[in-house]
Amino acid sequence: AIDIALWDIKGKSIEKPVYKLLGGPVRDKVISYPHVQGMNIPDLLESAKKHIDDGWKFLRWHQLETEPFDKNNNATFDPLKSVEKTIESFEEVRKIFGYDVQICLDVHTRLNPALTIEMCKELEQYKPFFIEDPARSENPNIYRLLRKKISLPLAAGEQWGSKWPFRQVIEEDLIDYARIDLCIVGGLTEALKITHWAETHYIDIVPHNPLGPVSAAACVSLCMASTNIGVQEMPRKPGLIDNKLFPKQIEWDDGYSWCPDVPGLGVDFNIEEAERCAIKPSRSGGNLYRPDGSFTNW
């Protein structure tokens, strides 16, 4: 947060957009993907249609749960049933919307390697853009096995807190897309190092951005100044939330995002509005349990 703020302050102090401080724009706009919602396939298809009608060229959803969350934000996740539903979701989306739209799947590290490999072999025919977090992130060596067994593009990195965990997967070419989280790895400064490092291995970056307007602006600034960009995560159109807190946000149109040609990150923060806002406890993403009662990854 401090690093990103310092880049914004520097840009505003010399009246330059942050993306120009990072090396200058190499593109006018950044292709982006939204979060397609739906706990079941009919709801997912409805959400997918809405996003396609709005102009998005990419869709992203995660490994489908097998039960809705209860009042305590808990749910049962059956890996075998989830794999079946996820494969079916691809089949239905391709049947209805064809292959002009790109699909990204986030496994959320919920499957063991054997199930991941089985699922990916079934998904090959539906040509996903990438499979994200197909294995737990503690042991990058697992990507050696997945690389041998899976032909689909792999994405990983959102859980890594600095450039060092990226070393092995970049140097050994174990992933196709680096999911750098600017708010975890150390801001724009560290993310820029990882981006340039990945470029030497022809690995594109897909910045992780499930957060708010400042994170989105920082990610898009990096993408506008970097050549090796796959796609940018953008959960929803900028400007749909936090409009009073952030009266100026980045731009979006027809599936693309970009930072305006203004000093700093391109966002304005309303301090007076922040002081008036009550702080609400954040809701967790939910707790998942296997059918036998054991805890599993969210």
Tell what function each PLM region has.
Residues 1-13, 298:
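Metal- or metallocofactor-binding catalytic centers and their adjacent structured scaffolds
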Residues 5-6, 47, 89, 194:
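Alpha-helical packing segments of well-folded alpha/beta enzyme cores
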Residues 13-25:
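Short, flexible active-site-proximal loops enriched in glycine and acidic residues
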Residues 17, 31, 102, 153, ...:
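Proline-centered loop/turn at the N-terminus of a beta-strand
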Residues 29-149:
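Metal-dependent enolase-superfamily TIM-barrel catalytic cores that perform enediolate-based chemistry
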Residues 265-298:
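Extended hydrophobic packing segments that form well-structured cores
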